[in-house]
Regions:
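Compositionally biased, intrinsically disordered low-complexity segments enriched in polar/Pro/Gly
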Residues: 1-131
Length: 131
């Protein structure tokens, strides 16, 4: 059953032969503010508008769960380095109003077999709203 997707790059799903999910997603929503400092008065704030939203998405990749960790990591790296713009959907609903770009990915290679096959890894991808 599909949980959601990050464009065609990753489909998050749970089935009898494959588990690919994220855990602990963090979404940050901020405003942009200027600070004016008049002499002899407290600083004045001025709202400039909304800032780009960001998401941090930790993902566990395991060959035991029907996922190819090395292939998935390579595809994520390509998306980062090529500036790929992607829709992000969870539960059939878009996350935010706009599409997203992956601004970075941090990988941990947990289990590498003696023949060099990566069988278990974690990756945290950093997304930023694309406007």
């Amino acid at each position: 059953m599909a949980i959601g997707n990050l464009g065609s790059l990753i489909t998050f799903s749970v089935s009898s032969d494959k588990v690919l999910t994220f855990d602990g997603m963090q979404r940050n929503i901020r405003g942009r503010w200027a600070k004016h400092e008049p002499i002899g008065q407290k600083p004045k704030k001025e709202f400039l508008g909304a800032d780009s939203r960001t998401v941090s998405l930790p993902i566990f990749l395991s060959a035991a769960h029907g996922v190819k960790p090395r292939t998935t990591l390579d595809r994520i790296a390509d998306a980062v380095e090529n500036g790929t713009v992607l829709p992000f959907v969870v539960g059939g609903k878009a996350v935010g109003k706009n599409k997203w770009v992956i601004t970075g990915a941090s990988e941990t290679w947990d289990v590498v077999m003696k023949d060099g096959r990566l069988v278990q890894a974690k990756v945290t991808i950093s997304l930023e709203e694309y406007v």
